[in-house]
Amino acid sequence: MSFALTREGIKPVAKGFALALALFQIWFTTGFGVLDGSMMRVMFVSFITVLVFLFIPCRKYKENEKEPTLFLLIDLCCAGLAIATAVYFALHLTEITTRMRYIDDVTPAAKFFAAATVLLVLEITRRTTGWALVIVASTLILYAFFGDMLPRAVKHTGFTFDVIVEHLFLLNEGVYGIPIGVATSTLFGFIMFGAFLERSKMSSIFMDLACLLTRNSQGGPAKVAIFASALFGTISGSAAANVYGTGTFTIPLMKKVGYRAPFAGAVEAVASTGGQLMPPVMGTAAFLMADLSGAGYLNVAKAALLPAILYYLALLVMIHFEAVKNDLGKLSPDMVPETKSVVSRLYYLVPIAVLILLLGMGRSVVFCANIATLSIVLLAMLKAETRFTFKSFIEALVASSRGALMVSACCACSGLIVGVLSLTGIGYKFINLITILAGDSLFLLMVYLMLTSFVLGMGIPTTPAYIVVATLGAPALIKAGAPQLVAHMFVFYYAILSFITPPVCVAAFAGAAIAESKAMETGFIALKLGIVAFIVPYMFVYQPALLGIGETPEIIWAAITAIIGVIGIAGGMQSWLLCSTSAWERAFLLIGGLSTDIIGFGLLFSVGIVQMLRRRRAPIAA
């Protein structure tokens, strides 16, 4: 029997490697096995590289187009090279870990595998996320080699090939640095948690619960999008992927009850992007922030909670005003699951409760993820429809590895970026430049950092976007006097908001594709709906109580005034509060939402009184 070498034909091999990676991670992260930390990172990157080359071709092919056998052979050779790199490290581990950095010679073999690894990492990043991150990393690597030839303002002293190889490959500074370390030890566990939750079909409770809660609310489908996307999004590492995951259900529903197509696409884009800001997982960025800021996971999650609530409150108020203003309908009865059915499945939420409880108790993040995943397997046994068979269990493990490809490739590539920044010092030059441009103005500095974070975050998934802006932008804000966690949260927000900021608003484009609307129109509506999120980071820099920093009364007062301000801004943006607003009322709402406590409350209160009196004179059907 002849064997044809095709992508489909090697799938069993690819799935075998995916299963091996999942078992490798379970064995060594749960404490059953012990492996040197450096070797674990090398093995993880090699696994990820092999899987990308086995699962993902170099380009997308049309339905009837056949992939050239030569291309597949090249991919297999690249996968073999990744395995050879791991073998090289395993055979020379003692030599590599005990050598005197920058003094001992770099062997020809090390130079070869270093060059190969860098090229392989750039290619797997391109295949999983596109060109954006690859261009940034490639530019910085070229800068490391040729930066000594540039003008004085940006030049460095020059580095030999050996020094660059050592820094990016032999030390835990480049490919095998902090980002891939977090991916290996932490992120994979949460990706596995999400994969098991989905494969068990227990995640269906998210959508059903959202439909039940909003069944009697005007414009209900848009509110379903908010609740479902907040739940799905926090365990997803990609805003665009979340749009496709929940938007295929919510966007057609929104259009059905009367929302315009671009508005429906924008709502889903903003709701899905917000999932990256919502604890406990925050698209896995919370764990990276805990490491890079040194704040610890619990402090990061606590700090992120109130701003995330403000984000979703603003979106909820805006779409409610849109629904009332245009007299949009509710969910039809056939769209709403029976209350008894939903209540009987509420225990599907127990794994998330277990995760939050264990994290709150201060247990290790890896332990929490593993126990939460185990709870899914045990609870799934209670019903035949959710129970794992041997086949579905293996499929969940394979799905875990496949789900880790994008974020892991990005972490490896981000390691290259961070490595070059630390080697050349260009990050410090950038910090000094924007500090000089801002002068003594904290506000100007924040504006420059906001714009920088937008640009650096464009088209890049959550995790690498945060790594890049945290490395370049956060130190400038810290230098200006902001607490470390506040600075990291500030740049993180704007890197994420690039997903809904034209011209490169990938989440909005995904929403537009499903809604069949114009991409840029959807993008600008998403920008409008997410406007509060663009203001909140400025608020918590000036008032850290919004991040839970300070005394309890101060935090409560900051929360109350922020909520009032958010409602004012939402009303001003939608030209609606209790009824349609006049020009001066809209101005008062916007100014009041942005103003200090007493002035802002006074302006909003005055508009509310005027509109209440107007409604009494001429009742509005809503």
Each language-model region and where it sits:
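Conserved, well-structured core domains of diverse proteins
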Residues: 1-105, 111-115, 621
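Core transmembrane alpha-helical segments of multi-pass membrane transporters/permeases
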Residues: 84, 123, 128, 138-153, ...
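Long, contiguous bundles of hydrophobic transmembrane helices that form the permeation core
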Residues: 2-14, 18, 302-403, 506-590, ...
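Alpha-helical transmembrane segments
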Residues: 38-46, 181-191, 299-314, 364-373, ...
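Transmembrane alpha-helix interface/packing and boundary motifs in multi-pass membrane proteins
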Residues: 126, 194-198, 229-238, 270-276, ...
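Membrane-interfacial loop-to-helix junctions in multi-pass transporters
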Residues: 107-112, 173-186, 212-226, 257-263, ...
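Membrane-water interface regions at transmembrane-helix termini and the short interhelical loops
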Residues: 3-4, 28-33, 56-68, 117-131, ...
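Hydrophobic transmembrane alpha-helices that form the pore/transport pathway of multi-pass ion
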Residues: 207-275, 281-285, 294, 462-494, ...
